[in-house]
A protein has these predicted regions:
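Short alpha-beta junction capping motif
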Residues: 1-34, 142
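Residue-level detector of secondary-structure boundary/capping sites
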Residues: 3, 61, 151-155
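Extracytoplasmic/secreted proteins, especially bacterial periplasmic and envelope-associated proteins
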Residues: 7, 11, 39, 69, ...
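Short linear interaction motif-like sites in intrinsically disordered regions of transcription factors
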Residues: 10, 41-44, 59, 114, ...
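Short, flexible coil/turn micro-motifs enriched in small/turn-prone residues
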Residues: 14-16, 40, 140, 164
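Hydrophobic/aromatic-lined pockets within catalytic cores
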Residues: 17-21, 45-48, 164-172
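An acidic, glycine-rich "communication" segment
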Residues: 24-109, 117, 176-233
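A glycine-centered loop/beta-turn motif at secondary-structure junctions
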Residues: 73-76, 80-172
């Protein structure tokens, strides 16, 4: 695993075995392959698999799963984020929120890119997914969460809140979990303090999703680009 996710597997596995619901988001869905197969696949129905999954920044217009209770009350979701895709899923994964990456909505390719990711262009991707485990308990994973500002997008926040309630084994209210429009001050509460280097998080705007698309690189082009950047730093 990574420095963030590298221990506590047995403790969490024991909780899941007791029927505990579990939601993991963004970097938390990226364990090592061994832990991903042994724990994440049965826990939440999928994981970011090194050498297979990718982590570009792109504009996703996320569509919730029609008629599923997690979709209740969910409005428009249009956000730019480091939405991982080409996730390694369990065969019984439920696609709770999906979007399609392509050449027009790519902001830029990040550090992890692969042939599988390159070939996923134009294919619908479950960015939010869930699983119903044997015995009836549930788990879910979400690849978004890099840009904190996106929590101020009502539909985005609503979908995740609904999913948390669903994963806990509760019925999602007909109009969705009760929530309200977030202010900029609220968006900045309880964040780490980096002193003078702390940046205030701004509310999302149309400018955040307006950009000239980046290049959908082949794996070789990506390797060459990264090598060029390294040479420039020397």
């Amino acid at each position: 695993g990574t420095p963030v996710i590298r221990s506590g597997w047995e403790k969490m596995d024991a909780l899941v075995a007791k029927g505990t619901g579990l939601v993991l988001m963004h970097y938390a869905v990226h364990p090592g392959i061994k832990e991903g197969e042994k724990y994440y696949t049965p826990w939440i129905g999928g994981y970011f698999k090194n050498g297979h999954s990718v982590n570009p920044f792109w504009r996703a217009k996320i569509t919730p799963l029609k008629d599923h209770e997690t979709a209740r009350g969910v409005g428009k979701i249009d956000a730019v984020d480091e939405f991982y895709f080409n996730i390694q899923y369990h065969k019984n994964m439920i696609p709770l929120g999906s979007a399609t990456p392509n050449e027009k909505n790519l902001h830029h390719i990040n550090n992890l890119w692969s042939r599988a990711g390159y070939e996923a262009k134009g294919k619908s991707q479950a960015l939010l997914w869930g699983i119903e485990r044997p015995g009836g308990s549930r788990g879910a994973g979400f690849t978004g969460g890099h840009h904190h500002r996106n929590w101020a997008i009502d539909g985005y926040r609503q979908l995740i809140l609904n999913t948390i309630v669903w994963t806990a084994g509760k019925e999602v209210p007909k109009g969705g979990v009760s929530t309200y429009t977030v202010t900029e001050d609220e968006l900045n509460e309880n964040l780490d303090d980096y002193g003078p280097k702390t940046n205030r998080v701004k509310l999302p705007t149309e400018a955040d999703v307006t950009f000239s698309p980046g290049k959908w690189m082949t794996p070789q082009e990506h390797v060459e680009m990264r090598a060029k950047r390294i040479r420039k730093k020397k």
